[in-house]
């Protein structure tokens, strides 16, 4: 019988790609999502892409803070593990609305952990983030690097990591893997699912794709005087399909009897500048991206990229795709879905 996995936030960007990989890997997936920053359209497309495997997918519109609704789902299915993506994730908004972020992300997680314990499901993969490294003094960031988030969003990730460690310390039956991932980019090679941010994109590449399809006039590059090869900020961009595979590898690792509460970086181990990413996208799409140069944004780190040795060694996982593949698949998604899953804006059908 297929192993059954609960995926919170499974309608989101990384969640939907991971759900597809779960189904294709022989798992059954139950998704809970409140659709605050996603839509059910992504899961309908996942179901289609998965073909017959799509029969092993079900999804429910549930907020993790709604304990009775969560208990009902746990009472109906015996889960082997939970992959926890759900959470608000805009850095700027978190600064403006910290209590919203603490309530949604932390209270939601605590409720989830309580219900998991209540129903005897103590296997968890948590989506943390490289944002917990703050402004790293040294790169690459290893799992032992100091952690100090610089905004409320990052602090919710950091606090949830600590909560997970405390839960494991109190009960050694728990097996928890914390995945700190870097900058996800790209889309499923089919171009049928991808990133569809609501409102103004917070990250570089979704913004670039909206410029390319004519939804925005130009890209503003914040900071051109960093001590980097071209003066722009450097990040570790990772293909979303590699990231999805990393979650499957983490799920398999939970079967290891020696696992307690472990942290793994998921990145490529390579730093790429803003201008290098834009150039790679221009090459993949054949589109010129107009740029406006601006000063640094407060809080932006200069260079952040991952040490990936631990994940390679212990999860037997390594990112396969480079920035060319990321940009190719991103453009395939964007050009086929210029308005994302919202078909009403461009007159096409989902």
Curated annotation (Swiss-Prot):
Residues given in the record as NAD(+) binding sites: 12-14, 33-37, 63-64, 85, 89, 157, 181
Catalytic function, reaction form: UDP-alpha-D-glucose = UDP-alpha-D-galactose
UniProt pathway: Carbohydrate metabolism; galactose metabolism
Residues at the active site: 153
Tissues in which the UniProt entry reports expression: Widely expressed. Most highly expressed in stems and flowers.
UniProt GO BP: cell wall biogenesis; cell wall organization; galactose metabolic process
Keywords assigned: Carbohydrate metabolism, Cell wall biogenesis/degradation, Cytoplasm, Galactose metabolism, Isomerase, NAD
Binding site for substrate: 129-131, 181-183, 202-204, 220-222, 235, 297-300
Top-rank taxon, per record: Eukaryota
Primary location class: cytoplasm
Subcellular location: Cytoplasm
Required cofactor names: NAD(+)
InterPro entries xrefs: NAD(P)-bd_dom, NAD(P)-bd_dom_sf, UDP_G4E
pH dependence per the entry: Optimum pH is 7.0-9.0.
Record's subunit section: Forms homodimers and heterodimers.
Function in brief: Catalyzes the interconversion between UDP-glucose and UDP-galactose. Cooperates with UGE3 in pollen development and with UGE4 in cell wall carbohydrate biosynthesis and growth.
Family named by the database record: Belongs to the NAD(P)-dependent epimerase/dehydratase family.
PANTHER family the record matches: UDP-GLUCOSE 4-EPIMERASE (PTHR43725), UDP-GLUCOSE 4-EPIMERASE 2 (PTHR43725:SF44)
Name of protein: UDP-glucose 4-epimerase 2
Organism of provenance: Arabidopsis thaliana
